[in-house]
Every structure is written in C-alpha cells, then in structure tokens.
Amino acid sequence: VVNSISKTGNATGWRVGWAISPKAYTPALRAFHDTMVIQAPTPFQQAAVTLLELDRSSYVAIRTAYVSRRDLLVGALRHVGFGVSPPQGAYYVFARYADVPRIGGVSPVAATQHLLKQVGVACVPGDNFYAAGGSTSHYLRFAFCRSLSTLKNAAERLASLG
C-alpha cells in the first residue's frame, strides 16, 4: 500500500507519504525510496500526523468541498463547449477544447496563452502530460484546488468564450 496526504490534506507539493509492505519487501522499498526523495521536513510530518488523526467528518467535509468545486468548474467548462468527464479522485479536469469558440482550432499552447492573456484563466496544455500531437492534442488541464470564490470568478471569465 502506498499513499500520501497530498490531495486529502490540501498539501500538494509536500511529498509526505508512506508505504506498507510485507517485511521481506521493506529493504528494497527503502533502497528505492532513498534514491528518489529526501526526507520530508519535520513540520510537514507533524502536520501529516495531525491530518491522519482527524475524525471521519473532517474527511467528508474535504470531499464535499472538492465535489462542489469540481462541479462548478465542470459546469462552466461545458457551458462554453469544452468536453469534460468529471474526475472521481483528482483535483483537476482534463477538458477537450476542439469545439470551444476562439480556441478550438489552435494548438494547446496557443489555447492556454489565449485563456491566460485574453480571458484571465490559467490552465496547462494536455500535451504536457502525454505525447504531443496524439489523442490529447486538443485537451487542456484545469485545476479546481482553489477557493470557491476564485473558481466562480474563473467561471465568469470563461463565459466570455461562448
């Protein structure tokens, strides 16, 4: 079992996680781990312990907040023509933009630049996550791990595309 506090703990980038394995595998896991990462800072580890000690209602509240944010962003993207399948466990949306007015016929980089400079919404080209020019050539990635007010503002800005 491998897990982390990244999404649940709103601590992306902290790289605090753990692995549970049969004793026979532990030396190999440690050797691999030692070559891949450094120790997480002590305050991050202490924060992770605090997170793991929360009661179930805290996790339900975190999930509810993410679902609200996801649904807001997905609705805003669909409203202007993005093709979107709502994610079930991530805090980002991978959206097809081929049918979106003003950006449908351009490259992923040009689409992200237009959205940032003309609309005021930041996203990342889908090609950053897959081979360029493949089936992801008309996809953009939007994150919804922001405040609800920031996402509402982004939704209003995205509406200008339609």
Language-model segment annotations:
Residues V1-G162:
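PLP-dependent class I/II
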